[in-house]
């Protein structure tokens, strides 16, 4: 099940499909990473006006309309879909956090102290790694460590 996105975001997906281009290609054209671009297409990140104008050129859609709908007045409503997720790929990521979340948390605390890994100041990368037993998916979360403050 694909999560519901706004009509403006649906226009982006339709234009992307019509052009037959990838998030990576769009990202290179507007100066952003493919994961960030995909996130913005789902309404989970916010394009600035310059990015929207570049995006409209890449996708060959109306700049005025997309800026009107996704410009300064629009803000993301982050978090899509049910918990637990029903999509198999998203569920496996969710399962990874359920199974390995506490061990990862313990190691973060051992290496950094009492705090969290930011998902706001975070870069995410998805790579394909060849392997004789079947290609591997490598997902990297590169988040800033934020120590808890004391007062």
UniProtKB/Swiss-Prot annotation:
Keyword list, A-Z: Lyase
EC number in record: 4.2.1.104
Pfam families xref list: Cyanate_lyase, CYNS_N
Molecular function (Gene Ontology), one example: cyanate hydratase activity
Reaction equations catalysed: cyanate + hydrogencarbonate + 3 H(+) = NH4(+) + 2 CO2
Top-level taxon: Eukaryota
InterPro entries associated with the record: Cyanase (IPR008076), Cyanate_lyase_C (IPR003712), Cyanate_lyase_C_sf (IPR036581), CYNS_N (IPR048564), Lambda_DNA-bd_dom_sf (IPR010982)
Gene3D superfamilies from the UniProt entry: Cyanate lyase, C-terminal domain (3.30.1160.10), lambda repressor-like DNA-binding domains (1.10.260.40)
Enzyme class name: lyase
Positions annotated as active site in the UniProt record: 92, 95, 118
NCBIfam families in alphabetical order: cynS, PRK02866.1
Role noted for this protein: Catalyzes the reaction of cyanate with bicarbonate to produce ammonia and carbon dioxide.
Family annotation (HAMAP family): Cyanate_hydrat (MF_00535)
Similarity annotation: Belongs to the cyanase family.
Name recorded for this polypeptide: Cyanate hydratase
Organism: Coprinopsis cinerea (strain Okayama-7 / 130 / ATCC MYA-4618 / FGSC 9003) (Inky cap fungus)
Taxonomy of the source species: Eukaryota, Fungi, Dikarya, Basidiomycota, Agaricomycotina
Name of the gene encoding the protein in the UniProt record: CYN1
């Amino acid at each position: 099940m694909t999560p519901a996105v706004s009509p403006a975001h649906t226009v982006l997906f339709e234009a992307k499909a019509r052009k037959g281009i990838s998030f990576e290609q769009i990202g290179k054209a507007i100066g952003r990473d493919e994961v960030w671009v995909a996130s913005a297409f789902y309404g989970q990140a916010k394009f600035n006006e310059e990015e929207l104008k570049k995006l409209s050129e890449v996708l060959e859609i109306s700049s005025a309309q997309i800026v009107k709908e996704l410009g300064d007045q629009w803000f993301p409503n982050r978090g899509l879909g049910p918990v637990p997720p029903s999509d198999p790929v998203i569920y496996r990521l969710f399962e990874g956090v359920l199974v390995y979340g506490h061990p990862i948390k313990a190691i973060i605390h051992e290496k950094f102290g009492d705090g969290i890994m930011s998902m706001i100041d975070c870069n995410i990368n998805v790579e394909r790694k060849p392997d004789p037993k079947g290609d591997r998916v490598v997902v990297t979360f590169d988040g800033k460590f934020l120590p808890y403050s004391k007062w």
